[in-house]
């Protein structure tokens, strides 16, 4: 499957499903026309939109005021697509099966703050299978989760130009066996964060609080901080190695709510947890006024 221009994207709406199951020897590939024609290079990014999957699983921020997050009436408009909504109250919602699947040269900014990622998982439920997936050379995030409960395994993110992993709007899930190498070639903008986590509306009071666990991650950052955790969510990283360039730091935690004690807010499980994690950066963390080393 290929797209011809930046705005081309495949959108799987709520109530629909995608079944894209390749094999290790013959993965399913979504790419750009230029790649099919043989004109893409190692620097190519943003040659088509990407894959957007919309589900009915709980999210943390609703478009309509007065609607309770996590209920059937809570929905939000997804970035990059007109009149497309996600969210609901079905944690076990099933948007299909994706296995042995690769996205190449995708991602497109329609306007500031309105971008298509390599893969967008918005309100996708844990009934969905998401395994053996690679996103290569996206001009925006590799994969962005907007709420939802879908879990993933065997994820490879290479050469992406913004965040490789971006989780927000009350995403609750576990992802295991992840490899990340940031974009770092001559003339490229370079990747942003290996993992950026936050909230859907910038607040720290989402009543469907983000609770995200990554395990068995090997990541090589390009520069800056490798991981940015903020927004008062609950985060855990286990059995992982995070390495960075000479100028990079491994961890930046912002906001007092992000390190508050368990029980201090709705669904609050406490500060970020790191178990058996090896940090190999020029500095282990950013010691700033948001959250200090103390």
Indicate where each model-derived feature is located.
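Extracellular beta-rich repeat passengers
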Residues: 3-15, 22-23, 27-162, 166-294
């Amino acid at each position: 499957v290929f797209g011809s221009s930046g705005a081309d994207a495949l959108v799987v709406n709520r109530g629909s499903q995608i079944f894209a199951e390749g094999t290790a020897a013959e993965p399913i590939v979504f790419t750009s026309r230029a790649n099919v024609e043989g004109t893409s290079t190692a620097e190519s990014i943003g040659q088509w939109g990407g894959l957007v999957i919309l589900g009915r699983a709980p999210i943390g921020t609703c478009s309509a005021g007065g609607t309770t997050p996590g209920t059937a009436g809570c929905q939000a408009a997804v970035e990059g697509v007109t009149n497309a909504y996600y969210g609901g109250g079905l944690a076990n919602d099933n948007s299909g099966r994706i296995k042995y699947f690769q996205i190449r040269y995708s991602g497109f900014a329609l306007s500031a703050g309105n971008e298509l990622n390599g893969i967008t998982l918005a309100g996708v439920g844990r009934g969905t299978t998401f395994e053996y997936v690679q996103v290569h050379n996206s001009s925006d995030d590799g994969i962005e989760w907007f709420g939802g409960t879908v879990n993933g395994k065997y994820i490879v993110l290479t050469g992406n130009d913004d965040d490789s992993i971006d989780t927000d709007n009350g995403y609750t899930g576990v992802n295991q066996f992840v490899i990340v190498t940031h974009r770092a070639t001559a003339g490229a903008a370079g990747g942003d964060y290996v993992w950026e986590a936050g909230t859907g509306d910038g607040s720290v009071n989402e009543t469907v609080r983000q609770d995200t666990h990554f395990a068995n991650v090997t990541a090589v950052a390009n520069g800056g901080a490798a991981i940015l955790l903020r927004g008062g969510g609950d985060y855990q990283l286990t059995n992982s190695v995070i390495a960075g360039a000479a100028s990079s730091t491994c961890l930046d935690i912002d906001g007092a709510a992000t390190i508050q004690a368990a029980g201090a807010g709705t669904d609050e499980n406490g500060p970020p947890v790191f178990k058996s994690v090896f940090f190999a950066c020029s500095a282990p963390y950013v010691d700033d006024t948001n959250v200090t080393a103390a």
